From Swiss-Prot:
Membrane topology per record: Single-pass type I membrane protein
Organism, as annotated: Oryctolagus cuniculus
Originating gene: CD247
Subcellular location, principal: membrane
Domain comment (free text): The ITAM domains mediate interaction with SHB.
Top-level taxonomic group: Eukaryota
Cytoplasmic side: 52-165
TM region(s), chain numbering: 31-51
GO MF, one annotated term: protein homodimerization activity
Protein name per Swiss-Prot or TrEMBL: T-cell surface glycoprotein CD3 zeta chain
The entry's keywords: Adaptive immunity, Cell membrane, Disulfide bond, Immunity, Membrane, Phosphoprotein, Receptor, Repeat, Signal, Transmembrane, Transmembrane helix
Cellular localization per UniProt: Cell membrane
Basic and acidic residues bias (residue ranges): 86-98
């Protein structure tokens, strides 16, 4: 049986010469010319739209005396806050139910450097309020860098120590 298949394959190979099929795929010159034409048309259309938008005299936006539109004048109020509220009712904290929030004058973002802690190689500057005494189990060393809400969550969980291996 194997000899039959082998003989038939040899006869077919002798009568029909082996030629490679020329399949260009994406390297076919006709396809490249077609894609170049599409890319050229796309470039012309985008350039025309850009020039039309740049040089057209459409409706002018009303300009205030300061030279900016009214939308931007509301934002340029002369003072700079980290997170400025766009709401007209400034100072109301949505997390407190819209109640007025009072700022402490000494409420800053960071504590000052302390000379005695600078002796440690890996000391860090803590946030104000971190050194306050908290209610809990007294594991403040475990909870460094966590917010008060996260610390309370960890205090509420009963953490068991793992047995030694």
């Amino acid at each position: 049986m194997k000899w039959k298949v082998l003989v038939i394959a040899a006869v077919l190979k002798a009568h029909f010469p082996v030629t490679e099929a020329h399949i260009f795929g994406l390297l076919d010159p006709k396809l490249c010319y077609l894609l170049d034409g599409i890319l050229f048309l796309y470039g012309v259309i985008v350039t025309a739209l850009y020039l039309r938008a740049k040089f057209s005299r459409g409706e002018d936006v009303p300009v205030s005396p300061q030279g900016h539109t009214q939308l931007y004048n509301e934002l340029n109020i002369g003072r700079r806050e980290e997170y400025d509220v766009l709401d007209k009712r400034r100072g109301r904290d949505p997390e407190m139910g819209g109640k007025q929030r009072r700022k402490n004058p000494q409420e800053g973002l960071y504590n000052a450097l302390q000379k005695d802690k600078m002796a440690e190689a890996y000391s860090e500057i803590g946030m104000k309020g971190e050194n306050q005494r908290r209610r809990g189990k007294g594991h403040d060393g475990l909870y460094q860098g966590l917010s008060a809400a996260t610390k309370d969550t960890y205090d509420a969980l009963h953490m068991q120590t793992l047995p030694p291996r």
